[in-house]
Swiss-Prot record:
Protein name: Phosphatidylinositol-3,5-bisphosphate 3-phosphatase MTMR2
GO terms of molecular function: phosphatidylinositol-3,5-bisphosphate 3-phosphatase activity; phosphatidylinositol-3-phosphate phosphatase activity; protein tyrosine phosphatase activity
Bias type Low complexity, positions: 596-612
Annotated organism of origin: Danio rerio (Zebrafish)
Chain positions recorded as a 1,2-diacyl-sn-glycero-3-phospho-(1D-myo-inositol-3,5-bisphosphate) binding sites: N306, N331, I332, S394, D395, G396, W397, D398, R399, R435, R439
Single GO cellular component term: cytosol
Occurrences of domain GRAM (ranges): 39-116
Residues that coordinate or bind a 1,2-diacyl-sn-glycero-3-phospho-(1D-myo-inositol-3-phosphate): N306, N331, I332, S394, D395, G396, W397, D398, R399, R439
E.C. code: 3.1.3.95
Disordered: region residues: 1-48, 590-620
InterPro entries linked: GRAM, Myotubularin, Myotubularin-like_Pase_dom, PH-like_dom_sf, Prot-tyrosine_phosphatase-like, Tyr_Pase_AS, Tyr_Pase_cat, Tyr_Pase_dom
Length: 620
């Protein structure tokens, strides 16, 4: 799809800048830091061209087979050798020039199954369905030794360790990096950055042991006028005990972004005076507005249907001065089906003659548009309307996380830096209980599980859409986003394991596994956007009309060699960064030279009339 030439749209708001204090905790990544940053003690991957398999520490070969045929959908059958370790699958064909290879973390696999009848007697053919938009197929002979396990059995065992009562590879991987990524996010430090606590908001310890809500973080920010006893009663009224708590506060207007789950009003319109008091306190904490907007992510029909199950939505009669808005974002099942259709359209081959109609039939970009449009409405109410908002869906851990995190990226430039984005993911997704284990299915062979859904993928896709519209507003590049998605599935790091903060602490994830951010922060130069310009007060209002959105080809169609750029984009980024550093150094040298000459000239002309010199500003 081609990018539309038009920039503005009646459906959306244009980008704007507001005068605002800088909350960024720490400077952006400097060129000096990039040059001096320490690298990992051991590289993650060695050079595979020397014949040896590039194994990680504690990665062990479990099975290998020669004379295996990979049925490549792009260039036809390729014969080579296949090796399965406790972490990944290698396929190598050394008869081709250049050497052909596949390197697939087993965590990426969603399904492994024997398929059809192979071409020859004694042959076995099996297909691998992947979570990263690929499907792979291999054919090889069964082992002669009946006691020897087949590659298929080994794959089933190590691709789905949870189903086989085994540990994920992340618990074995012990690579040491210069920085501990588990310390990236400190909730109290993030509160302090936002100016919390203050006269209107307090930090509650009520959930320190996860007794109030086991899917919420230990640190909660709530209005000062609400007691802990009242919070307990609110907890019994909100689905899964997920009470309204602060996500972000505007540094000037004090307008707040608050998240929760649906109220359990049921068919009889049950009310909770403590819940009503809490939402009134949220409104009162913002002196600039006497109104509160409640954004329900669901279609109104779905929200009404939830009343049959005891759920529902806030009545405007019960919540004075509150306005309810439905954002029409569909549930996890609709999103899962949409991604399935998208995979059929983009892999392995694209039907050129029906590309646009086929893409439209998946409704993928329509869903992306609705998520972005919802986040934009939230950001606009907070920034332009100076009004506090409450955001929820049903349980408050899927669509709610998408909306709050995207709105925060639009509102706060700190979250558009590399480290700020890491904090955002840790805060809005991990600490607030997005169910990564259920939605991704780490190590679980039950590929038909109805709890699986690409919720986090959609969020990253929305971020990518914004980086296209505001190429200088984000410190990170596209490769950063793709790396996060690759390791969402890889099970190499512990970052995306489990369903909640409580579960991760119970499983001792920070002690027993390595954080993805340890790896990322050890090689920041790989992920820096050379076009980035730091403006602390810049608020982003992206254009969300469907004609301004694009399919993320570099992610969804990256396995098709016809769609692959001749040179990796992130390699060009690195070259641009090096050139920028070189030019910046030259500018500094010239400025020192000009200053030296000016000082020398001034001393020579002491006592004589002086000329005013207009300084020349240079931008690199």
């Amino acid at each position: 799809m081609e990018e539309s030439a038009s920039v503005d749209s009646v459906e959306s708001l244009c980008s704007s800048t507001t005068t605002r204090s800088d909350r960024s905790s720490g400077p952006k990544v400097s060129d000096t830091e990039l040059r001096s940053k320490g690298r990992p003690i051991e590289k993650m991957y060695k050079d595979p061209s020397k014949g040896e398999l590039p194994l990680l520490p504690v990665e062990l070969v479990q099975e290998s087979a020669k004379d295996v045929t990979y049925i490549c959908p792009f260039i036809g059958p390729i014969r080579g050798s296949l090796t399965v370790t406790n972490y990944r699958l290698f396929f190598r064909c050394t008869d081709r020039e250049p050497v052909f290879g596949l390197d697939l973390p087993l965590g990426v696999l969603s399904r492994v199954e024997k398929i059809g009848a192979a071409t020859g007697r004694g042959d076995v053919s099996y297909g691998l369905a992947c979570k990263d938009m690929r499907n792979l197929r291999f054919v090889h002979k069964e082992p002669d030794d009946s006691l020897k396990k087949s590659v298929f059995e080994v794959l089933m065992k190590f691709a789905f360790p949870v189903s086989n009562n085994m540990s994920l590879f992340a618990f074995e991987y012990k690579q040491v990096f210069p920085e501990n990524g588990w310390k990236v996010y400190d909730p109290l430090a993030e509160c302090k950055r936002q100016g919390l606590p203050n006269e209107s908001w307090r930090i509650s310890k009520l959930n320190d042991h996860y007794e109030l809500c086991d899917s919420y973080p230990a640190t909660l920010v709530v209005p000062v006028t609400i007691t802990d006893d009242e919070l307990r009663r609110v907890s019994s009224f909100r689905a899964k005990g997920r009470i309204p708590v602060l996500s972000w506060i505007h540094p000037e207007s004090q307008a707040a972004v608050v998240r929760s789950s649906q109220p359990m009003v049921g068919q009889n319109g049950r009310r909770c005076k403590e819940d009503e008091k809490l939402l009134q306190a949220i409104m009162d904490a913002n002196a600039q507005s006497h109104k509160l907007f409640i954004f329900d992510a669901r279609p109104s029909v779905n929200a009404a249907a939830n009343k049959m199950k005891g759920g529902g939505f806030e009545s405007e009669d019960a919540y004075q001065n509150a306005e309810l808005v439905f954002l029409d974002i569909h549930n996890i099942h609709v999103m899962r089906e949409s991604l399935r259709k998208l995979k059929e359209v983009v892999y392995p081959n694209i039907e050129e003659s029906h590309w646009l109609s086929n893409l439209e039939s998946t409704h993928w970009l329509e869903h992306i548009k609705l998520i972005l449009a919802g986040a934009l409405r939230i950001a606009d109410k907070v920034e332009s309307g100076k009004t506090s908002v409450v955001v929820h869906c049903s349980d408050g851990w899927d669509r709610t996380a998408q909306l709050t995190s995207l709105a925060l990226i639009m509102l706060d430039s700190h979250y558009r830096t590399i480290r700020g984005f890491q904090i955002l993911v840790e805060k809005e997704w991990l600490s607030f209980g997005h169910r990564f284990q259920q939605r991704v299915g780490h190590g679980d062979k039950n590929h038909t599980d109805v709890d699986r859904s690409p919720i986090f993928l959609q969020f990253i896709d929305c971020v990518w859409q914004m980086t296209r519209q505001f190429p200088a507003a984000f410190e990170f590049n596209e490769y950063f986003l793709i790396t996060i998605l690759d390791h969402l599935y890889s099970c190499l790091f512990g970052t995306f394991l489990c369903n909640s903060e409580q579960q991760r602490l119970k499983e001792e994830i920070p002690k027993r596994t390595v954080s993805l951010w340890s790896f990322v922060n050890s090689q920041l130069e790989e992920f820096v956007n050379p076009l980035y310009v730091h403006y602390s007060s810049h608020v982003l209002f992206p254009t969300v009309g469907i004609r301004h959105l694009q399919l993320w080809v570099s992610y969804y169609i990256r396995w098709n060699p016809r769609m692959r750029p001749q040179e990796p984009v992130h390699q060009r980024y690195k070259e641009l960064l090096a050139k920028r550093a070189e030019l910046q150094k030259r500018v500094e040298e010239l400025q020192r030279e000009v200053s030296s000459r000016t000082a020398s000239s001034s001393s020579e002309r002491a006592g004589s009339p002086t000329r005013s010199i207009t300084p020349v500003q240079t931008f690199v």
